[in-house]
Amino acid sequence: MSGKELRYGFTTGACAAAAVKAAAQMLRDQAMVREVELMLPCGIGANFQVHGGVLRDNTASCYVVKDAGDDPDVTNGAEIHVTASIEFFTKNEIKIEGGTGIGRVTKPGLAVPVGAWAINPVPRSMILEVVKEVFALRCIPATLTFSISIPNGEELAKRTLNERLGIVGGLSILGTTGIVKPISAKAWTDTVDASVDVALACGARTVVLATGRSSEIVAQKHLSLSEEAFVMMGDHFGYAMRSCASKGVPEVVVAGQFAKLVKIACGHEQTHVTSSQMDLDALAWWLREVPATAHLEQMAREANTARHLLEASGYNKALIELVCSRVLKVCADVAPWMKARVMLAGYHGDLLYFSP
């Protein structure tokens, strides 16, 4: 490892609020703005460079380029545009609207109501605060409208889970702290929470927690459930289980391929770990204790990977049932009051096991 310290970045919400502040200052002062300072919800002050400023009559527009730091965020480098307009001698009002590349919410269960622009509560609050700050001393009755857009937002959104959550037409303006931690799991766990909320709001009684897209596809082929019922948990097994339990999900199906299920069976609540040999050693001990699988103990100790063991065993039924039963035990330990089932997806798109 190089030891290089990873850079933090800024959320779309922080960038939108910065662009709004710049556009508001341009309207107020009728002058260009090159940089704005913003106090983020986490209590940190940050400076944002402002680009593309245009002043025309009672409108002002500009944009801020999102810097996600060292986080692999699909929105890194995206331009967050804002057009501000003022209409004098009307009621005092601040309007926040979405434009090109900003999604609309079409499913219940999210922090934003159905039909509204996908601008989450914290960014919306940030925007209102900066507008009030800029126009604090102006008492002229006026309506201020701020339209947020991301030119390539609709295309970028295809690389996110927005469509699955029912956010169509573009990206969301997100963020609770204003900063993005590099290589952070929070974006993923936030999406897990939102996905479970949407599933419940759409009437799902069973939620499928998939470790990856391949296992999710297998589950979708074999379960007659609405698309909202399928939640991509990735490596966040423990978090996803507790999210479902805390929100009152009656039943979960944990769907994964063999290697991931072995990690869960070994008690890893976060399955992105590098203890593969330790997992196989633990599995070897379990195999030894069961007469039907005792002959596989040495094979497990010599296997390179969990997948290698599965294939070398000839997809041994007792081996598969042993691992899945261990997964169910871990599920019961994590969320004892929630019913759980396990689905083992094969590496070639087939279903290998589904617990009753």
Swiss-Prot record:
Species, as recorded: Geobacter sp. (strain M21)
Q: Which one GO biological process term can you cite for this protein?
A: methylation
Q: Which UniProt keywords apply?
A: Cobalamin biosynthesis, Methyltransferase, S-adenosyl-L-methionine, Transferase
The entry assigns this protein to a family as follows: Belongs to the CbiD family.
GO MF annotation terms: cobalt-precorrin-5B C1-methyltransferase activity
Q: Which gene encodes it?
A: cbiD
Query: Quick check: keyword Coiled coil in the entry?
Result: no
Reaction(s) catalysed (UniProt annotation)? Co-precorrin-5B + S-adenosyl-L-methionine = Co-precorrin-6A + S-adenosyl-L-homocysteine
Name assigned to this protein: Cobalt-precorrin-5B C(1)-methyltransferase
Question: Which InterPro entries would you find in this protein's record?
Answer: CbiD (IPR002748), CbiD_sf (IPR036074)
Q: Name one Pfam family in it.
A: CbiD
Cite the annotated pathway.
Cofactor biosynthesis; adenosylcobalamin biosynthesis; cob(II)yrinate a,c-diamide from sirohydrochlorin (anaerobic route): step 6/10
| EC nos | 2.1.1.195
Q: What is the lineage of its organism?
A: Bacteria, Pseudomonadati, Thermodesulfobacteriota, Desulfuromonadia, Geobacterales
